[in-house]
Amino acid sequence: MILLTGATGTAGSFIANEFVRERVPVRILVRNRAKAAGLEKVSTVEIVEGDMSKRSSLGPALDGVDRALMISAPDMDMVETQSTFIDAAKAEGVRHVIKFSGLDARPDTTFPFGLMHLEIEKYLEASGLVWTQLRPTGFMQEYLREAPSITKDGALYLALGNTKLNPIDVSDVAKVGFLLLRDGGHEEARIPMTGPEALTMVEIADRISRAIGRTVQYVPISPEQRRQALIAHGIPAPIADALDKQVKERLKGGIESQVDLSTRQIFNIQPTTFLEFAQRNAAAFGAAA
């Protein structure tokens, strides 16, 4: 049996859809069954309710599981939540845990979530379980959050200066996550994934423009303006502060400005370009019907 957690989130839902499309049996762990209503009638999907942060709730989800892919919400309790899941997986006899981590899981980062991912990776590797760390870069889907200003003002307001980033389509990552869960292997491996291009925000705005058929301009703002905008949109201050540190780190360049297609070659996956992503999501970005 294989188990997928986080199946109602951004990445987890894409991975769940891969299982549905390929008709491969999978068990998914959700806190709220209602959020997985679209999967209720899929004969190859077993839905189990439980909370990754509450070990006592995880027995039914982990019973008979050989491999599990671990994803949880990016919040300030992520280390505690995922460590609890790792402990429960070990106690229930799970053999192999695949952690959905991040490219910024490294000791020299100042980004709190990168440091959290690294701490969890170390905990998993010390647990005695077989492990795999899947490390994608930031998602192209993050730019969909900018759709309101793109639609209203024809502007992409971000605090990223002239830096280049290597965003990846979540659907590409989901294909690798699916294959790791279905087939196993790649044990004690750290698997990086990036998009096929390192792009400035001007270049990203250009690709959105081409996809929707009207001009979108990149308008640089300050990191503090970005932080205040996040808070104004309901992002909790600790999360906004963490993202502020990520922005300041991205402005320095580094690993998120580099392209690495080695994982795609191993798994034989054709990378999605940002233009292809923008064309597929043109309506969301405000293209005329």
Task: Annotate the PLM regions.
Residues M1-L39, S53-V65, P74-S83, D87-H96, ...:
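Oxidoreductase cofactor-interface core, primarily capturing Rossmann-like NAD(P)-dependent enzymes
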Residues F14, E224-A289:
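A hydrophobic C-terminal alpha-helical subdomain
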Residues K41-S53:
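Rossmann-fold cofactor-recognition segment
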Residues I71:
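Catalytic metal- and UDP-sugar-binding loop of GT-A-like glycosyltransferases, i.e.
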